[in-house]
Amino acid sequence: MDDQGCPRCKTTKYRNPSLKLMVNVCGHTLCESCVDLLFVRGAGNCPECGTPLRKSNFRVQLFEDPTVDKEVEIRKKVLKIYNKREEDFPSLREYNDFLEEVEEIVFNLTNNVDLENTKKKMEIYQKENKDVIQKNKLKLTREQEELEEALEVERQEHEQRRLFIQKEEELQQALKRKNKQAFLDELESSDLPVALLLAQHKDRSTQLEMQLEKPRSMKPVTFSTGIKMGQQISLAPIQKLEEALYEYQPLQIETCGPQVPEQELLGRLGYLNHVRAASPQDLAGGYTSSLACHRALQDAFSGLFWQPR
């Protein structure tokens, strides 16, 4: 925290935790007091790099590294021009090349690399694709409106559910108070024994609790994320698919070498004569001499017939 501070007045967040740092398009930070002092006329030059700046373009620094704030702002401006989508390209390769070009432009503008040619390239692209840029802007605006409408519907439905739950709770409290008052009235006016009245009141209270605890079905609501909330989950078994039985196909391995004998034939062919016999402890763990010998033969025979082309 003590590393974050205003380069002009040298005030740090360690000394002043409420310090508000501002950043502009050049990526250099200034505290709010220095911004008000240096840009009292609405415009001025950055004390670090001398770039002409407007006071209205200053914004609160969100990231610890001001370069990240600069990159975020540059990316927003670049994407307003380079706003093509995947469906605007005939192939995925061309779309990926377009995305790579966008990243290169953002990198150059963020790190001050070849600024003149990069800005000229953006101007040429903007002129050549003016119609496509405008069409995608309108498309994006429509999608934002649809998203805002979905969020508003979600908010209204959430408010309706909240009011519904609140009314249910108030109704439950009213029924409980009514039941309690009825019990008190019976105690005053009835000639029945208190134990019997108490048992009847307990039974009525239990039935009332069971009625109140019954789950109420709620209408499924589709949120802006596309997830339906409140819907009942079906526990019915999945329908069995009638398919042909799996048929095992032996694995065909091309070793470019002689055929390795089967494991069962290694002892007859003399391959196990000089292989250490497996101990009882080895056998308990699943180890056999023929298994190790078979693996060694596979490694030894592999690639013996290979010839370079």
UniProtKB/Swiss-Prot annotation:
Residues 142-161 form the UIM domain. One of its GO terms (cellular component) is transcription factor TFIIH holo complex. PROSITE patterns: UIM (PS50330), ZF_RING_1 (PS00518), ZF_RING_2 (PS50089). SMART domains: RING. Stabilizes the cyclin H-CDK7 complex to form a functional CDK-activating kinase (CAK) enzymatic complex. CAK activates the cyclin-associated kinases CDK1, CDK2, CDK4 and CDK6 by threonine phosphorylation. CAK complexed to the core-TFIIH basal transcription factor activates RNA polymerase II by serine phosphorylation of the repetitive C-terminal domain (CTD) of its large subunit (POLR2A), allowing its escape from the promoter and elongation of the transcripts. Involved in cell cycle control and in RNA transcription by RNA polymerase II. The lineage of its organism: Eukaryota, Metazoa, Chordata, Craniata, Vertebrata. The modification Phosphoserine is found at residue 279. This is CDK-activating kinase assembly factor MAT1. Its main location: nucleus. GO terms for biological process: adult heart development; G1/S transition of mitotic cell cycle; negative regulation of apoptotic process; nucleotide-excision repair; positive regulation of smooth muscle cell proliferation; regulation of DNA-templated transcription; regulation of G1/S transition of mitotic cell cycle; regulation of transcription by RNA polymerase II.
